[in-house]
Amino acid sequence: DKEIVLAGNDERGTFYALQTLSRLLKDNQLPAVEIKDYPSIRFRGVVEGFYGTPWSHAARLRQLKFYGENKMNTYIYGPKDDPYHSSPNWRLPYPEKEAEQLQELVKVAKENEVDFVWAIHPGQDIKWNQEDRDNLLAKFEKMYDLGVRSFAVFFDDISGEGTNPVKQAELLNYIDENFVKVKKDVTPLVMCPTEYNKSWSDPKGGYLTTLGDKLNPSIQIMWTGDRVISDITQEGIQWINERIKRPAYIWWNFPVSDYVRDHLLLGPVYGNDTRIA
């Protein structure tokens, strides 16, 4: 007798096994095979973090289905032109329609074994005081009520007092200790630093070293490589990891077209070091 056995390390692994099975089935026939499949990279997915017109709700729903089918486990919501993600309205709750759409995205992400990470971008006008700490936690509570269980804070592409690494670390640790760890079912916090690539960094690593020293160890720190748009190399990973004292959370800017809007960038992938996984 022949049988089909799907086994995964957890519910998500079994879901991925089902995706493999669906691709093997052709004309109601199935080859006699044994497939052992596992990821070499922990976080696999997409950041919607570009400038310009954000994706439509329908496009995001299609994307989440695509991620599940292709065993991608992370979608980070952070479109720069969403005013409730960034300035001027990051302190305010989403209007009813947008809140309902986000709630649906969280639901569909879960159905496709994708972690929906909601990001906030407060750095351009944040005040380093208790009032804005409370504002940020209140916004996170609103998103938690919509079903979000993964969160990120972006300090990229800002200027002024918001770039202070000591203040950033104090705020992030406060969120970590008063929200993330309190909730029990929220995944580790992710942050995008102001100096998110090597070419923009202090050669001595002052900003990055401060984050590495002061941020709670569980907080993930994003990194785009030697430049904004860059190959990811083993040497580059070693450089950043030494400074932030944890494995970098790679935000690979490919394909990024918000600076070239008259055509699509669809070239092949090359240049990334296969040893970085």
Short names for language-model regions:
Residues 1, 10, 27, 37, ...:
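Acidic-enriched, low-complexity/disordered segments with a strong bias for Aspartate over Glutamate
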Residues 2-132, 136-139, 145-149:
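Feature activates predominantly on carbohydrate-active enzymes
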Residues 50, 139, 158-277:
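Catalytic-core regions of glycoside hydrolase
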